[in-house]
């Protein structure tokens, strides 16, 4: 503001206008900066969302791929084992389990030397870290082969579904995971179908039933404990496979020797048959592949899912089993029960593997003894 010589009072607005222009420019810069930051935040948020979606898609593919790999491996070894033990009348399922242990040790040992796989070296506390998996692993293998030898494949497949219920209960108790209502309904339907099929088993074999039920309990324990060890131990899936086989080799060899199975197997007259030898070696190698696929499937899925996928492959095994081995006796009630169990397996597969937009949520429960499914 200034006074003119003529005595008139006038206002000099130029400084005020200049200050206003500066303020407007500062405000525009702030607004522009805020908009830029907002766009940057929106861009980074969309990138994070896109990255998360890619990770979810990759995990989904791994879940499906590992489940299919396990199902195919389980199907192949069931058919090959049945051919060796029943069609060729190989006398010792214990010796066959020893061959499968040997194949796992040799393949993984060579793989580590060639740096194809990696796992920690043997230490004094290695056995304690993976216990009780070696015992479960050996028992599951031996009793599973025993059940395969003594029962027809359709009945073996039906009775194996009891392992699903056992796995579900163990997951609740040990891992604190409660299955959804749809999962529970499908599991109970599978068990009901298996019971219906077993009620009219015309080729009943008590020893085979005992073998399979022991295998069911061990399969459930194996799946749950593998999941637990993979989450809490640095040994990894290759280490679990290798040390399970390594620690149980000598006990399995001693058991073969004491029971006379070693002599029976070595004196088997079909060793000159090249087709049988190929089948036997394939059974040994498939034992290793099955162990790997089981751990891989359990790593990317739940132990219950791994168990159900193993039973889903029995859709093919059930019908092929009517012709493989020649020891299946057909009845309508048995067939209806088997198909109910198969349909329930398909229901569980749909419930478990359907793709969801939101991440799967599991209820973690306190490990109390009073909880029931």
From Swiss-Prot:
One Pfam family here: TPT
Modified residues (Phosphoserine): 50
TM spans (from-to): 89-111, 131-153, 174-196, 206-225, 238-260, 275-297, 302-324, 329-351
Entry keywords, A to Z: Golgi apparatus, Membrane, Phosphoprotein, Sugar transport, Transmembrane, Transmembrane helix, Transport
GO BP annotations listed: compound eye morphogenesis; embryonic pattern specification; imaginal disc pattern formation; imaginal disc-derived wing morphogenesis; nucleotide-sugar transmembrane transport; segment polarity determination; sensory organ development; UDP-galactose transmembrane transport
Compartment annotation: Golgi apparatus membrane
Region annotated Disordered, chain positions: 27-49
GO molecular function: antiporter activity; UDP-galactose transmembrane transporter activity; UDP-glucose transmembrane transporter activity; UDP-glucuronate transmembrane transporter activity; UDP-N-acetylgalactosamine transmembrane transporter activity; UDP-N-acetylglucosamine transmembrane transporter activity; UDP-xylose transmembrane transporter activity
Topology of this chain in the membrane: Multi-pass membrane protein
PANTHER family from the UniProt entry: SOLUTE CARRIER FAMILY 35
Protein name: UDP-sugar transporter UST74c
Organism: Drosophila melanogaster (Fruit fly)
């Amino acid at each position: 503001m200034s006074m003119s010589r003529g005595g008139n009072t006038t206002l000099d607005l130029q400084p005020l206008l200049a200050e206003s222009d500066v303020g407007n420019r500062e405000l525009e810069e702030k607004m522009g900066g805020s908009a830029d930051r907002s766009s940057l935040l929106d861009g980074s948020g969309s990138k994070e969302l896109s990255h998360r979606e890619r990770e979810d898609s990759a995990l989904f593919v791994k879940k499906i791929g590992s489940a299919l790999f396990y199902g195919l491996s389980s199907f192949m070894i069931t058919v090959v084992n049945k051919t060796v033990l029943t069609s060729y009348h190989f006398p010792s399922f214990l010796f066959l389990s020893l061959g499968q242990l040997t194949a796992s040790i040799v393949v993984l040992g060579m793989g580590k030397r060639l740096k194809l796989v990696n796992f920690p070296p043997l230490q004094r506390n290695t056995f304690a870290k993976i216990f009780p998996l070696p015992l479960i692993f050996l028992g599951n293998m031996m009793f599973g082969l025993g059940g395969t030898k003594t029962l027809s494949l359709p009945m073996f497949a039906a009775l194996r579904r009891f392992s699903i219920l056992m796995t579900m209960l163990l997951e609740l108790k040990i891992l604190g995971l409660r299955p959804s209502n749809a999962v529970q309904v499908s599991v109970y339907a599978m068990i009901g179908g298996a019971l219906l099929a077993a009620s009219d088993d015309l080729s009943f074999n008590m020893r085979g039933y005992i073998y399979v039920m022991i295998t069911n309990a061990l399969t459930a324990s194996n799946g749950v404990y593998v999941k637990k060890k993979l989450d809490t131990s640095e040994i990894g899936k290759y280490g679990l496979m290798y040390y399970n086989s390594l620690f149980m080799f000598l006990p399995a060899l001693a058991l073969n020797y004491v029971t006379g199975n070693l002599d029976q197997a070595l004196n088997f007259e079909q060793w000159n048959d090249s087709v049988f030898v190929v089948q036997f070696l394939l059974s040994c190698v498939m034992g290793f592949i099955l162990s790997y696929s089981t751990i891989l499937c359990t790593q990317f899925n739940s132990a219950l899912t791994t168990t159900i996928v193993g039973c889903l492959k029995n859709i093919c095994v059930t019908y092929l089993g009517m012709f493989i081995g020649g020891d299946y006796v057909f009845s309508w009630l048995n067939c209806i029960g088997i198909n109910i169990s198969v349909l329930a397996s398909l229901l569980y597969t749909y419930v478990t593997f359907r793709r969801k937009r939101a991440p799967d949520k599991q209820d973690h429960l306190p490990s109390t003894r009073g909880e029931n499914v």
